[in-house]
UniProtKB/Swiss-Prot annotation:
This is Peptidyl-tRNA hydrolase. One of its GO terms (biological process) is rescue of stalled ribosome. One of its GO terms (cellular component) is cytoplasm. It comes from Salmonella typhimurium (strain LT2 / SGSC1412 / ATCC 700720). SUPFAM superfamilies: Peptidyl-tRNA hydrolase-like.
Length: 194
């Protein structure tokens, strides 16, 4: 099944742009830049959108302008309008359980406490079977510190690692369309930024 919608999760507004929780949006921003497809606000989809072609496939990019816990509103609206099935969607999000410098593809699964994923699963009719790009941001080591951590900005050393992992993820996304998910996954999952 080809991917038809790539989503980068974020909170809206300048005050959140550089926070760890917006790592998914950084990836979609990079894809849009690499493929010269600037994102434009599209109110009916509650987000910034663009359209790209990868290996002859028509793909939509989306960064919701809703708050993170309402991400499903944007994803649901676009999926419904273009008749996109859950397994044709790739959602990029920040991942506490992976260190900075690592990113991994995954199909399906739970939300792991991630409010953006939780809302998307709900708005897709409780169907969790969409693809994810998990962008590692690390963990503060104490679950009571998670909210402050994801809404905080990473230090320069960590930002560099996250950026390198996102860059590799963008290359692997293009590889996915060229040579398939298995090859893209194999390459991405052996990558670790230094």
């Amino acid at each position: 099944m080809a991917i038809k919608l790539i989503v980068g999760l974020a909170n809206p507004g300048a005050e959140y742009a550089a926070t760890r929780h917006n790592a998914g949006a950084w990836y979609v921003d990079l894809l849009a830049e690499r493929l010269r497809a600037p994102l434009r606000e599209e109110p009916k989809f509650f987000g910034y959108t663009s359209r790209i072609t990868l290996e002859g496939e028509d793909v939509r990019l989306l960064v919701p302008t809703t708050f993170m816990n309402l991400s499903g509103k944007a994803v649901g609206a676009m999926a419904s309008f273009y008749r996109i099935q859950p397994d044709e969607i790739l959602v990029a999000h920040d991942e506490l359980d992976l260190p900075p410098g690592v990113a991994k593809f995954k199909l399906g699964g739970g939300h792991g406490g991630h409010n953006g994923l939780k809302d998307i699963i709900s708005k897709l009719g409780n169907n969790p079977n969409f693809h994810r790009l998990r962008v590692g941001i690390g963990h503060p080591g104490d679950k009571n510190k998670v909210v402050g951590f994801v809404l905080g900005k990473p230090p320069v050393s960590e930002q560099k690692l996250i950026d390198e992992a996102i860059d590799e993820a963008a290359r692997c996304t293009e590889l996915w369309f060229k040579e398939g998910l298995a090859k893209a996954t194999s390459r991405l999952h052996t990558f670790k930024a230094q």
